[in-house]
Swiss-Prot record:
Disulfide bonds: none annotated. PROSITE patterns: RAP. One of its GO terms (biological process) is mitochondrial mRNA processing. Pfam families: FAST_1, FAST_2, RAP. This is FAST kinase domain-containing protein 4. Keywords: Mitochondrion, Transit peptide. Plays a role in processing of mitochondrial RNA precursors and in stabilization of a subset of mature mitochondrial RNA species, such as MT-CO1, MT-CO2, MT-CYB, MT-CO3, MT-ND3, MT-ND5 and MT-ATP8/6. May play a role in cell cycle progression. GO terms for molecular function: RNA binding. It is found in: Mitochondrion matrix. Residues 559-617 form the RAP domain. Belongs to the FAST kinase family. InterPro entries: FAST_2, FAST_kinase, FAST_Leu-rich, RAP.
Length: 629
């Protein structure tokens, strides 16, 4: 055994002595370690590899050379010519230098597209690209990912062999790259990969980012990934949201803003993450700038995420900034709170005052945005006359020249706020405008036409001096509601209670579609004694196609039941949104007594008897209030 061991040691030492001259100086110490390791391991492992194989494996990762003069020349270069001259000079370029020159070239020409085009045609540049291609396997990881970004920004031809070579090298190394390098690729190269048909590289990059998501340890990387790459992969975004929940305590106000804006841009209503962010916004007294507050309000509004304490803080923190806001920022802020359905009276009064103070600088588009926000929330400012005088003054000469859908939106908003003028009604009810919406089948155009029906109803019911034009009778005829439309719990319970109350189909109707663009939950007729009358026997002017012909008997009352769901109200309020205030006003103007059935009252009713008694009591109160007038 000892003799065999001595023979093996002698062979290994002879081989090591022969190989020493071929090893670079920086590797000599490493060689000793390798030889020693080989000697010891060969005793216990007869299958261990030869020294040559170990040396080959050891030399795969060459050490980064010391900083040379050429490195300083590359870093200090201010003109492309200085960099290209390095190729033909006496400088010794190692395997990274050519790539570094390309990276520096792309930086110098980042905002000079004309010079980029000339550079790509330069023979020296083409020589440089070929040199990089020949050395690509020796380029270090960090330099390689920057090189790919630089080649994209230099706009090489899509079929460029050298570009494809760099992309392929990146693909081969993806598994070995650090996560920060993957993040760099996602941040800087993903848009180019999509545009330049490098979809395989992009897909593989996203797979590696998703598999290694647990390596994210800092908030900056996480937020950057959500912003730059989250929209490219649903599964990756899900992982990033999970990581956000883990790291959200480390976020500062700007990082919270970026996450919220990313969620808003992708319309991702991630409730657990939104709750966590809201908690930290409320609990931590972050100092926030005007821009941050505006972005937060926009994101919460876009995602329709209602959090009372956050909305209160945003409104309170924004109030001191209003005098310094531009009209555009006021419009954006008002729209955000309108989407949130949050009416903060001091804030909205400040909006009004600021617009009146800067009336000369307010553009029509910004004023329109504020008007639509006011209408959504049914907000009537204290300086109502001055504000609407400004609105009419701005609209007076240009309303008819605006985009048709915008014309309808503006006049509809004025109808909601009871500030519309006859000339404005005539502009949007003109046959030349409504025909295009009547014939269209797109949901957006149908929604606009529904607003036209509401405007037409306003003209009919609230403006007796208005003489026309009106929408044609065929246009206002309600279309049949889809049979598969899902009923809300309140709607179903209310219908069941009404059926139990009425008992007979002749004494009431459910889901009554009127010619005014509104649907009544139920309609009944009461005589002077308070007894039900058969509906079908009497005239019904609110229907597009009346069924009866007898006039109502003296003292008879027509009653409409209107249910109000949770989304019909301003947030944390019992005040209806503007659209539903308009509906109630129209129903009253059409000659009905209204029985309101709000969700917050209905929820307190547990038994069928309570629900029936509630409806009877509401009818008696409606009749008593009418008689008391």
């Amino acid at each position: 055994m000892a003799v065999r061991l001595m023979k093996q040691c002698t062979c290994l030492l002879r081989e090591a002595t022969r190989l020493v001259p071929t090893v670079a100086p920086v590797g000599r110490l490493r060689l000793a370690g390798v030889a020693c390791k080989t000697l010891t391991s060969s005793v216990s492992s007869p299958s261990s590899g030869s020294l040559t194989e170990l040396l080959g494996k050891e030399q795969v990762f060459t050490p980064y050379p010391e900083h040379q003069e050429v490195d300083y020349l590359i870093e200090k270069a201010t003109r492309p010519e200085e960099l290209l001259e390095l190729l033909g000079g006496d400088h010794s370029l190692h395997h990274n230098h050519a790539a570094l020159i390309l990276i520096r070239l792309s930086y110098l020409l980042s905002e000079k597209p004309k010079e980029k085009a000339l550079l790509v045609e330069d023979a020296r540049f083409q020589q440089l690209v070929r040199l990089v291609d020949s050395q690509i396997t020796s380029v270090w990881h960090g330099t390689l990912v920057k090189l790919l970004r630089s080649l994209y920004t230099l706009v090489l031809p899509q079929g460029s062999k050298e570009l494809r070579s760099v992309e392929q090298e990146v693909r081969w190394r993806l598994r070995r790259l650090k996560y920060k390098h993957l993040v760099f690729l996602a941040e800087s190269c993903a848009p180019f990969m999509k545009e330049q048909h490098s979809k395989e590289l992009l897909a593989e990059l996203l797979r590696h980012l998703e598999r290694r998501w647990t390596e994210i340890s800092d908030s900056r990387t996480l937020v950057s990934m959500m912003t730059m790459a989250g929209h490219l992969s649903e599964s990756l975004m899900n992982r990033l949201e999970d990581k956000c929940l883990e790291l959200v305590e480390q976020f500062g106000p700007d990082e919270l803003r970026k996450v919220l804006m990313t969620l808003a841009a992708q319309s991702r209503r991630s409730v657990p993450l939104l709750r966590a962010i809201s908690y930290h916004l409320v609990q931590k007294p972050f100092p926030m700038t005007k821009g941050m507050l505006l972005d937060l309000a926009y994101a919460y509004g876009k995602l329709s995420f209602h959090q009372t304490q956050v909305a209160q803080r945003l409104a309170a923190d924004l109030l001191p900034f209003i005098p310094s806001m531009t009209p555009g920022e006021v419009a954006r802020c008002a729209k955000s709170f309108a989407f949130l359905k949050w009416l903060n009276l001091p804030l909205f009064e400040a909006f009004t005052q600021h617009l009146l103070n800067s009336a000369q600088d307010v553009s029509l588009s910004h004023l329109c945005s504020v008007l639509l926000a006011f209408a959504r929330l049914n907000f009537h400012p204290e300086q109502e006359d001055q504000f609407f005088n400004l609105v009419h003054e701005k609209l007076d000469s240009v309303l008819g020249s605006l985009e048709p859908a915008l014309q309808v939106d503006l006049v509809w908003a004025l109808c909601v706020l009871q500030q519309v003028q006859v000339a404005e009604l005539q502009t949007v009810l003109h046959p030349g405008l409504h025909t295009r919406f009547l014939e269209s089948k797109s949901p957006k155009d149908q929604s606009t036409f529904q607003k036209l029906v509401h405007i037409n109803s306003t003209a009919l019911l609230e403006y007796p001096e208005y003489k026309g034009p009106f929408l044609p009778a065929s246009a206002v005829a309600p279309s049949p509601s889809p049979s598969n439309k899902k009923m809300t719990p309140l709607q179903k319970e209310l219908q069941d209670a009404l059926k139990a109350l009425l008992g007979n189909n002749d004494t009431g109707s459910l889901e009554v579609a009127t010619q005014y663009g509104w649907v009544l939950d139920a309609e009944v007729l009461l005589d002077a004694e308070g007894h039900f009358l058969p509906l079908r026997d009497f005239v019904a002017p609110h229907l597009a196609q009346p069924v009866g012909n007898q006039p109502l008997p003296p003292g008879a009352k027509r009653i409409a039941f209107l249910r109000w769901e949770f989304p019909n109200f301003n947030s944390r309020s019992k005040d209806l949104l503007g659209r539903f205030v308009l509906a109630r006003r129209h129903v009253l103007a059409a000659g009905f007594l209204v029985v309101d059935v709000p969700y917050y009252e209905w929820l307190d009713l547990k038994s069928e008897w309570q629900k029936t008694a509630y409806l009877k009591d509401k009818m008696r109160k409606a009749v008593a209030e009418e008689l008391a007038k």
